[in-house]
Amino acid sequence: MIELQNISWQTPEGRKVLKDVSLKLRDKRLIAISGPNGGGKTTLARILMGIEQPSSGKILYNGRDITSLDVTARAALGISFGFQQPVSFKGITVRRILTLAAGHPLSEEKICDLLQKVGLCAKDYLDRDIDSTLSGGESKRIEIATVLARDTSFVVFDEPEAGIDLWSFEKLIDVFENLRSQEERTLVVISHQERILRIADEIIIIGEGQIKDHGPGPEMLSKMLHSDNLVAHRCGRTEVSYE
């Protein structure tokens, strides 16, 4: 479990982005963090990852204070993250990137298993380069496979739907549904997409740098969709609005 205790963060200019945020992110569930743009979601994700350090407050992982630990040190403890925009590596194959992510040799069977978990036909991708010939959806799923290869127990995904088309997004939802039901790990997904919120065990709403609401996924989504100023899908969109 990760526990945030009174976490605040501000820009060098002094603008407060997170204000005294306290949360418990419990094990073995899919937790969606949502809210309006500029509300503090991505900053919170970066603090969880160790990319940013809070201005004040503590972060505990299974009771251990990890506030000052960087990305590498947190990964060694079992915390990893998926990039919002996957990186291309010309000349590096999918097989190689998954082995590098794992940090040790992987059998072909294991690599195929990782690719199948993210909905890719392994034989078509093992020796493909990680470059611009991959679609946005393919790159996103390979990025998720690299996260799984690290075999960590706590994973943060920052807006995994960014930059992909609708068909790829539908496939991505399938991936997260499968991970939620089959994997013994905690998934924290930063998103405002209703389809992702629908499969969450818990939903946390952040706005103006503070926790606005927090509860079981179905209960929270019902509350959001029955509040006139929170329903975006009534206007034909796939994301939930907080205006």
What kind of region is each of these model predictions?
Residues 34-36:
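The feature captures the beta-strand-to-loop junction immediately N-terminal to the Walker
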Residues 65-80, 224:
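ABC ATPase NBD coupling module
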Residues 85, 91-107:
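Q-loop/switch helix immediately C-terminal to the Walker
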Residues 2-4, 17-20:
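Conserved structural motif at the start of ABC-family nucleotide-binding domains
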Residues 159-160:
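Walker B catalytic motif
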Residues 49:
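Helix-to-loop junction immediately C-terminal to a conserved catalytic motif
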Residues 57-64, 110:
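Conserved ABC transporter NBD signature motif
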